[in-house]
Amino acid sequence: MTRQHFGTDGIRGTVGQPPITPDFVLRLAHAVGRVLRQTQERPVVLIGKDTRISGYMLESALESGFNSAGVDVVLLGPLPTPGVAYLTCAQRASLGVVISASHNPYPDNGIKFFSAQGSKLSDAWEQAVETALGEPPAWTNSANLGKARRLNDAAERYIEFCKNTFAQDLSLKGLKIVLDAAHGAAYQVGPKVLRELEAEVIAIGCSPDGLNINHEVGATHPDTLVRAVHAHHADYGIALDGDADRVLIVDATGRLYNGDELLYLMVADRMGRDEHVPGVVGTLMTNRAVELALQARGVEFVRAKVGDRYILEELTRRDWALGGEGSGHLLALDRHTTGDGIGSALQVLQACVRSRSTLAQLLAAVTLYPQVLLNVRLPPDQDWTTNRLLADAIQAVEQQLGASGRVLIRASGTEPLLRVMVEARDAQLADSCAQRLANAARAGWQGHTSLKNAPPMGAN
């Protein structure tokens, strides 16, 4: 049976449109509660959220749905996704729920779940919820209704968890760090963690109003951070996204380092301390230069499908700890059960402090191949694999690039977009090929029979 509502990272959409409506979210929570009650007499669910204005409404709907199924609820308030995962495990809750659409703008929102162990839930569990959604509600009698309470020190508990991942004999004293929390879930905890580790912190993107999450700030708009690092003559800049499960870092020169580079640095730091790293999981998008640099160190590299869910599955299957993707989702399963933007940033800063080296020095072995990523809006009910013009263009581009480049075409798991990626040793070639593929996709959907408007192969 196929899943109707769950995507690659829970359920996500535009608020007020199915499935992100109060009535559906209430039914969803009720269905999840019924699944939990099959194995637990009195389940307890933790609910956290980011700073979107719709979070209040959806939080109330979840609370009502869970209580109606006989499930108790603990409200955490605004908290990074990894904080919810941590507290779900630490509080021995039955389930963790996050209300967030991650890096998307405020009109979107979503619901995602964590198991009692703080990890993403299985396809089988999601299918069980889909099945329960298709059945009539089974309202619990009044005597067995659930209750709700707030965990007032949730943020402080997560702050301590983050600090405890940093070496006790090191600190950030003497470092000036700009933190951009994207007006999102880490707007309070992010600056506090860094300050309590003795850094001088300039906080930007830390004034949420319910409508400004991810708006020209955060990991999806790193230029804002780069400008702030220059303006404040900072040593480092840290960019998080709306739910703080991803991170990008800027050095004192304004150079931006993506998740691929930070993943390599984390591996190199561990190996430099004689830790064994048997293998690393990236994605189909991971830069080829990182793969080669890891292999040169004797580290096996495996590509999973795009998305931290699939990285996690592959890491678990192989019993490895480290994985990540260029967007800044980084996994260190011996530190946390899920991607943690603040925790990953601390690992990187710790490596710099311990070695007394800059990011550029630590990443001297990696020179990324130019990559061009374009987004093409997918028309409703269109299967990109049947686009004949795009298929022909892919074949032509792959022949031109040969072994020195890569083409990756995929549908986004969270938005109605086709992702077009071209990687080549030459930046202009990568750009022209990506533009050709994007134009081919658009032309194919518009019913065109040729690519007259596409740039010629190899054009600047």
Swiss-Prot record:
Any one GO MF annotation of this record: phosphoglucosamine mutase activity
Entry keyword Metal-binding: yes
EC number: 5.4.2.10
Keywords, comma-separated and alphabetical: Isomerase, Magnesium, Metal-binding, Phosphoprotein
Manner of cofactor binding, per the entry note: Binds 1 Mg(2+) ion per subunit.
Pfam families the record matches: PGM_PMM_I, PGM_PMM_II, PGM_PMM_III, PGM_PMM_IV
Positions carrying Phosphoserine: S102
Post-translational modification: Activated by phosphorylation.
Family matches, as InterPro entries: A-D-PHexomutase_a/b/a-I (IPR005844), A-D-PHexomutase_a/b/a-I/II/III (IPR016055), A-D-PHexomutase_a/b/a-II (IPR005845), A-D-PHexomutase_a/b/a-III (IPR005846), A-D-PHexomutase_C (IPR005843), A-D-PHexomutase_C_sf (IPR036900), A-D-PHexomutase_CS (IPR016066), Alpha-D-phosphohexomutase_SF (IPR005841)
Residues that, per the record, bind Mg(2+): S102, D241, D243, D245
Cofactor: Mg(2+)
Active site: S102 (phosphoserine intermediate)
Single Gene Ontology BP annotation: UDP-N-acetylglucosamine biosynthetic process
SUPFAM superfamilies membership: Phosphoglucomutase, C-terminal domain, Phosphoglucomutase, first 3 domains
Reactions catalysed according to its record: alpha-D-glucosamine 1-phosphate = D-glucosamine 6-phosphate
One GO CC term on file: cytosol
Family statement: Belongs to the phosphohexose mutase family.
Record's function text: Catalyzes the conversion of glucosamine-6-phosphate to glucosamine-1-phosphate.
Protein name stated in the entry: Phosphoglucosamine mutase
Protein's organism: Verminephrobacter eiseniae (strain EF01-2)
Gene behind this protein: glmM
